Amino acid sequence: GTHSAASMCIVNTANPKADVNIKSDYPTVIKKIQEDDNKENIGNDGWNDIGDFEIGQTVPYKFESNIPNINGYDTYYYAWHDVMDEALTFDPDSVAIHVRTEDKNYELAKDEFQVITNPGNGETFKVEIQDIKAIVDREFDQKNDLNENVYGQKVILRYNATLNDKAAEDTGRPGFENDVRLEFSNNPDHD
């Protein structure tokens, strides 16, 4: 899915006090750019919605998302699809993914995700994790009273792009867009 997920549920009528967990929790994504000038005035280490860069400069990007309650899933697919303006050149080697809580930060190993450049549909790149649930369950093994794992961890994907010479062809333009879409498992009964 790419937005919300919903499931039908069967209610246990033999036990009128049974708890029913509605699985409509889904991840969201926020995109930020790290402004290199004026970090002190911007705050948040310069992470902002816009940035001012010169041709040839490295432009740091960050996608922030979250792990929803995925206890009903055996596996959980997670992928970011990005469409960059042609004035930006993507650096696939710069991709880093962190899963974190207030107490712990885990950086995914390069073999735990895949970077696909020019995957089709006009996209510049796609970064996918085949089973982020297995990683979170292994690295953040926190159980609740029902012996289910506790989710809600932040997922942060960082990468760099370079403002290339194509930016000079359109200097009066207000900005160079970079759009992201998050794809994730939306059916707990299907791997």
Residue ranges and their predicted role:
Residues 8-72, 81, 177-182, 186-191:
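Serine/threonine-rich, low-complexity linker/repeat segments that form flexible spacers/stalks
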